[in-house]
């Protein structure tokens, strides 16, 4: 697994904010550090698309630089971020929860540089540095809709979930999905497992085939690149075996087997926050965690218009009439208090 770094130098005509870009400077370099492979057909691909949009909308003096390191190794993250600092980056995006710890340390050590991080996981007592913005997604809201659809569509009344590495983010997919399914059909049977990898396609394929062989006819996965294995399993089996994807619309990989994808539009969030900063004299409103969900249009289903019957559910979630669980504790409360199971 590798880390790709993109550097974009963007020519601006105004002076820059207090966070380290010298007044009178004419351009800023925007960098992105991605945990994992860039073209994962999912989470990281969405972030990369945002950079391509920035490149298109701010085309002057753009340069692209690649680097790589071993995923999950803290010292490698630090080394790559030091290189970005030496290259003159004024804004650095970190994509992936594995980069949460290093995001805090580098932002504290380099107050002159602005940072953003996608999907950070911090303790409740952590104070976010003023030059750091964290973006988290209420992905459980989209997964709830997917689970509801899966339960309605399943012929066998057996559905599955395959996650990558167990953690807060993957669990949000899982428990949102399970809650939505139970909301649609209290008697639905749900099997949830983890591949313990975001990149091992073969393991995910084996797990999917095992589930399908036991009568499960729909599998939702949230496993990064490994999810391709689930898609391949359904495609090879043919009619009657379905998948629900994650992060991006992946239906082109198996059009006849896809029901929908739970969209976490990392790209839209990254683009929105960055472009607003660029348009506002490079002011970076850090020191906070920004939550985005159905209400913001960055979480949902890839083909929501095909499922008119979920519109009322969307409204109830947005209006907080339905509080979707994102973890096991919340799910158990949901089952007992809402569904009376």
Swiss-Prot record:
Pfam families: Bmp (PF02608). Disulfide bonds: none annotated. It comes from the Bacteria. It is found in: Cell inner membrane. It is a lipid-anchor. GO terms for cellular component: plasma membrane. Residues 1-14 form the signal peptide. May be part of an ABC-type nucleoside uptake system involved in the purine salvage pathway. Belongs to the BMP lipoprotein family. Monomer. This is Basic membrane protein B. It comes from Borreliella afzelii (strain PKo). The gene is bmpB.
């Amino acid at each position: 697994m590798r880390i790709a770094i993109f550097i974009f130098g963007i020519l601006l005509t105004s002076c820059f904010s207090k966070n380290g870009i010298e007044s009178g400077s004419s351009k800023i370099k925007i960098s992105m550090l991605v945990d994992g492979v860039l073209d994962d057909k999912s989470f990281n691909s969405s972030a990369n698309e945002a950079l391509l949009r920035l490149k298109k909308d701010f085309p002057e003096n753009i340069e692209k630089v690649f680097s790589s390191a071993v995923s999950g190794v803290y010292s490698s993250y630090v080394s790559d971020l030091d290189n970005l600092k030496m290259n003159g980056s004024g804004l650095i995006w970190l994509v992936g929860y594995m980069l949460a710890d290093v995001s805090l340390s580098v932002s504290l050590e380099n107050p002159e540089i602005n940072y953003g991080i996608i999907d950070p996981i911090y303790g409740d007592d952590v104070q976010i540095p003023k030059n750091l913005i964290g973006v988290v997604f209420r992905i459980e809201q989209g997964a709830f809709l997917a689970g509801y659809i899966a339960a309605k569509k399943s012929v066998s009344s057996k559905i599955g979930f395959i996650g990558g590495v167990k953690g807060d983010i993957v669990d949000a997919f899982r428990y949102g999905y399970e809650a939505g399914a139970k909301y649609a059909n209290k008697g639905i049977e749900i099997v949830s497992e983890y591949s313990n990898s975001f990149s091992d396609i073969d393991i995910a394929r084996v797990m999917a085939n095992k589930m399908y062989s036991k009568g499960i006819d729909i599998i939702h996965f949230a496993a990064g690149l490994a999810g391709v294995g689930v898609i391949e399993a359904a495609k090879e089996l043919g009619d009657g075996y379905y998948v629900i994807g994650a992060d991006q619309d992946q239906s082109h990989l198996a059009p006849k087997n896809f029901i929908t994808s739970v969209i976490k539009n990392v790209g839209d969030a990254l683009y929105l926050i960055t472009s607003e900063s660029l348009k506002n004299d490079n002011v970076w409103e850090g020191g906070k965690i920004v939550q985005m969900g159905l209400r913001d249009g960055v979480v949902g289903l890839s083909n929501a218009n095909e499922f008119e019957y979920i519109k009322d559910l969307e409204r109830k979630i947005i209006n907080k009439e339905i509080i979707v669980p994102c973890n096991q504790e919340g799910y158990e409360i949901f089952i007992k208090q809402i569904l009376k199971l």
